[in-house]
Amino acid sequence: MLNPIVRKFQYGQHTVTLETGMMARQATAAVMVSMDDTAVFVTVVGQKKAKPGQDFFPLTVNYQERTYAAGRIPGSFFRREGRPSEGETLIARLIDRPIRPLFPEGFVNEVQVIATVVSVNPQVNPDIVAMIGASAALSLSGIPFNGPIGAARVGYINDQYVLNPTQDELKESKLDLVVAGTEAAVLMVESEAELLSEDQMLGAVVFGHEQQQVVIQNINELVKEAGKPRWDWQPEPVNEALNARVAALAEARLSDAYRITDKQERYAQVDVIKSETIATLLAEDETLDENELGEILHAIEKNVVRSRVLAGEPRIDGREKDMIRGLDVRTGVLPRTHGSALFTRGETQALVTATLGTARDAQVLDELMGERTDTFLFHYNFPPYSVGETGMVGSPKRREIGHGRLAKRGVLAVMPDMDKFPYTVRVVSEITESNGSSSMASVCGASLALMDAGVPIKAAVAGIAMGLVKEGDNYVVLSDILGDEDHLGDMDFKVAGSRDGISALQMDIKIEGITKEIMQVALNQAKGARLHILGVMEQAINAPRGDISEFAPRIHTIKINPDKIKDVIGKGGSVIRALTEETGTTIEIEDDGTVKIAATDGEKAKHAIRRIEEITAEIEVGRVYNGKVTRIVDFGAFVAIGGGKEGLVHISQIADKRVEKVTDYLQMGQEVPVKVLEVDRQGRIRLSIKEATEQSQPAAAPEAPAAEQGE
């Protein structure tokens, strides 16, 4: 009854298996893709009819990791998977970005792609497997889709590109780049790098695109065997007469409106033109569809902007193709934060802060393969006021998570190692104004805020967004694109890096035919823009501050004998708890005996270090210590010395005369000098008050109270 169709092929060092026809047969298409024991089950369901009045393409991509895939039970209270993690959201975006441009213009039927990780090999990341699965399932489904696509991860180890490196190999790699594309063209790139050159990055993109052809070939073969008939879908016929009428009413006016350089003023004028045009046309013919008129007007807008750029005319805001908008760079703008910066580029502005914390502030991530600790956090917030709108304010949306991750990639390469700078660092970027490339403004602001906070980053980094307008063989690459140029252009190309090289590259390409030469021009133009921005940033702050903020915790590190860790922690954590309360510091102890004391007050930190040194000091036989009585028993008293170690003063060692009752001579909490007589093999300490007193003042042995002497 079940008759699966299977294809196997070698992909780099891994074997990939595509299997369909076995499971989820009520879905439009379903594929199980495995790559060396990492298996992802991908389904596609498409609605045969579009919803009435639908004016956008409702594509949803869900990526979900099941902990059973790694042989684990979820660590949450309910012991089941909950809302998507940040990692799952990012991979869902990674799948969505290269497939979305391949659906035909005008196709508005609902399509849902669900990728479920069902088995995982710790060495093989499921993201590439899920992307291959989505491509295969869409190609098999019969839904209008101009695929398939291939996907590849590229590493750079020992000056060599490596296809689909394992997790262990990635630790040695200077590059982690994911590239996806069709047989003819690259569609998406997502990467982080350790400051590689433009040529090295471009080489990785080309290498990945060449290597993924084997994936496309095998999906095509699978479609020949198991593909469903292609849907008989046709785009709505173009109403040439209506298009001409709308153009006659609006094209010249829109062309004039797009010469207004101020964004808000321009948007207001464009809205007036659109509403007046639609009102005029509806007055002429009430049967016209308002949504259709809106789409025609949008197409005219797009054509106006693109044709002007291709003709070499100034851009929307009057700039030439390679000009950067005006920059305003300020640091130390918030008095009590550990580091802050306000970075403004034209009508895009980011208020960025850096906060320093201890290892205890690190984020513990419960991932598929277990827990992982992240000591560098980057959060990006995009409130509705940044574009002059009202809207919901709440948990971050997919876009905010994606932009935050891109900005983090841009800064990661220059962050100091934990052994040199043992702080957890959190950067928050608040986008206060937006008109294009707010994620790259976040990179610039983060670099400034980190230097303002005294974080010893290896170099300043800046980011820039590039755009492309292409018709036939004629193309123009635009530097520092506006929001409108992003929407109306053919490519969104973001590059972050230092003067020495690229730290992050993200590309989203909406058309086929972007050649290596075009990408080379864009990368070189982006380098010039990046260096210009870095020059302006360096005028505001050219190196990390020599000291961290007075409001930031200072971490002091000392080393103790690992055998003494238990003494510092105490029974059930009693000693370390008392220490933190007594000194007002945060104390963390590692297994190798490294102790980190964090405090905003230097004197408190010194006090904590002194107390820890007392606790861990070796007790010297024959030495006199100041002690405190902690317990009184019939046969003597226990006295704490040397940072809390208890020793016994036997009743015979309290005074140089016979003592009947210990409480006649000693009270709880009393401070007394004691001499160490012996430390036995089990670490038990024998003390004497009598000998300590004799050693310091021969005639000053403790005496019974006067009232008792008279009896």
Swiss-Prot record:
Residues 694-711 have a biased composition (Low complexity). Keywords: Cytoplasm, Magnesium, Metal-binding, Nucleotidyltransferase, RNA-binding, Transferase. Residues 689-711 are annotated as: Disordered. GO terms for biological process: mRNA catabolic process; RNA processing. It is found in: Cytoplasm. GO terms for cellular component: cytosol. Its main location: cytoplasm. Its EC number is 2.7.7.8. PROSITE patterns: KH_TYPE_1, S1. Its cofactor is Mg(2+). Belongs to the polyribonucleotide nucleotidyltransferase family. Involved in mRNA degradation. Catalyzes the phosphorolysis of single-stranded polyribonucleotides processively in the 3'- to 5'-direction. This is Polyribonucleotide nucleotidyltransferase. The gene is pnp.
